[in-house]
């Protein structure tokens, strides 16, 4: 037996200036064991705390279920109400067989006889492609492909094309809409899923399941409800709660630790909503910055400013959930390493970790939004205008306010989660977590 009184496992605690766990004296105890249980709460008090938490979570679940029931979209939703093609048109698929129109010369000649277009004009913005799905399946036809897609076109590229019989009078009835991306996107998704499961194991599987449930809430509730005329803020609050309940409890299980993270997330959502409501009004952000927004306002009668507020809340949900889960786990691990730590010391130790979170999230969201808005920023930079005026104009101002509000919500959620975790981690025996 070693005669050294200081265990090597306690060195990190001493380095941090935290008290080391003391050995439990032998003999009979009238109370519960302190080595694996709460230090200052008896069984009755711990039970009451769990009941209070159960009531709070139950109220959140009940409110969410009622909100889903009341706001659930009916047949009035505008999903699919706008035709994608003009009358007589249809969407098909094609594969480029050649970027040289001589490969489909017979089809080009037939079209020029009908519409009188010169063959040399076809060569400027068309490629030869075999129609693989839709009107004219099996034919090799010239497909209109202009601009950047034409420059990047290669034999074998798979296209989504629009067939418009009226267009035959001025050129080819087939025109480029987009690329078929099922294969590369599907491959990336499979690689991502495999890596998550391989690295995170059971937790990874559960997190993917939670993501699927949250995505289902977004796809089958939030989007249809917003397009059916329900109040955007109410839909966002209910949808956000449903997504967070699924993400937290499905991925991490039901425990006081995960409930702590959930409460921290709720606090962050509330703060973000309040900040977004104030920020959009104070900065006079209307959300009416492009044709897509104007289309929504005209067809769905959606308040664009409120919709912008909702987007700010949804944009920060993922990172918010990440920091609250990690903060709660950090405090729990501090308690497990040294069950003698007081709530104040647990909070202080947790905030040391939280400061690292804050330091990283300061640029995480900023870089994410900057990357998304890069073409817009470059276009704005072309203007002969003061930099500050450019940054505070239109869509760029929306991105800046969105980033600031999401970041403020994250920063405030960290101490809130840490405080809740420091108060609750001593309720549950260390070995139970």
Regions found by a protein language model. Give the residues of each.
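Helical hairpin unit composed of two closely spaced alpha helices linked by a short loop
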Residues: 322-384
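Hydrophobic secretory-pathway targeting helix
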Residues: 1-89
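Membrane interfacial helix motifs at helix-loop boundaries and amphipathic/re-entrant anchors
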Residues: 168-181, 223-235, 280-309, 380-403
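Extracytoplasmic/periplasmic regions of membrane proteins
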Residues: 75-183
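Transmembrane alpha-helical segments that form the functional core of multipass membrane systems
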Residues: 191-194, 202-294, 302-315
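Cytosolic-side membrane-insertion boundary helix
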Residues: 171-211
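Hydrophobic alpha-helical transmembrane segments of membrane transport and translocation systems
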Residues: 368-370, 374-433
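Pore-lining and gate-forming transmembrane alpha-helices of multi-pass membrane transport proteins
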Residues: 261-269, 297-314, 360, 364, ...
